[in-house]
A protein has these predicted regions:
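Short, well-structured alpha-helical interface segments that form or flank functional binding sites
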Residues: 14, 24, 90, 105, ...
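Short amphipathic alpha helix immediately N-terminal
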Residues: 101-118
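N-terminal interaction/assembly modules
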Residues: 1-98, 147-164
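A short hydrophobic/aromatic micro-motif that marks alpha-helical segments and, especially, helix-coil
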Residues: 38, 118-120, 145
Length: 164
């Protein structure tokens, strides 16, 4: 159980440290989505289908089939981007909820150190505590966040994958 516990703790720390990167990734994907939608508006042909399968695929496709293939690829890419954005937003919301469930001081310590990358001693000075006390409270808070994210109501760790 100890190895699982450490894995969950490490994963929780990674989610917190990557929080700003996740925000940035969503912004990049939103821009890619807008670009693909603009490109889709230029491809005016609806996808051609023969039976249940998309048409084309041979080296001698017609213009309509090439446009249909392009449209299909763009729509698949758009769907993947939407899925990725949804997954990141779900992870971010889970992390936000777990951190906000902490006591205000613990929330501040965790957010400042792991998300904002503020050193323990700077947080300690601001809170008028020793660096060791802040570090200890931070580690305890991370354990609580990990428990909130990964432990089910029966008290056992769930086999959950937040980011595939």
């Amino acid at each position: 159980m100890q190895a699982e516990y450490n894995d969950y703790m490490l994963l929780t720390r990674r989610y917190l440290k990557d929080y700003k990167k996740m925000q940035s990734d969503i912004g990049v994907w939103e821009q890619q989505k807008a670009d693909i939608k603009a490109e889709l508006s230029d491809v005016s042909v609806a996808i051609s289908r023969y039976g249940g399968e998309p048409g084309g695929g041979s080296g001698d496709m017609t213009v309509v089939e090439r446009q249909a293939e392009t449209r299909g690829k763009l729509e698949a890419k758009l769907s993947l981007i939407d899925h990725n954005i949804g997954e990141l937003r779900r992870v971010m919301k889970t992390v936000e909820t777990a951190v906000s469930a902490l006591e205000p001081e613990a929330c501040e310590i965790v957010w400042d150190h792991y998300v904002e990358r503020v050193e323990w001693n700077v947080i300690a000075d601001r809170l008028y505590l020793s660096s060791a006390a802040v570090r200890q409270r931070g580690h305890r808070a991370i354990r609580d966040v990990a428990n909130t994210i990964f432990v089910n109501r029966a008290g056992t760790y769930e086999q959950v994958v937040l980011i595939a």
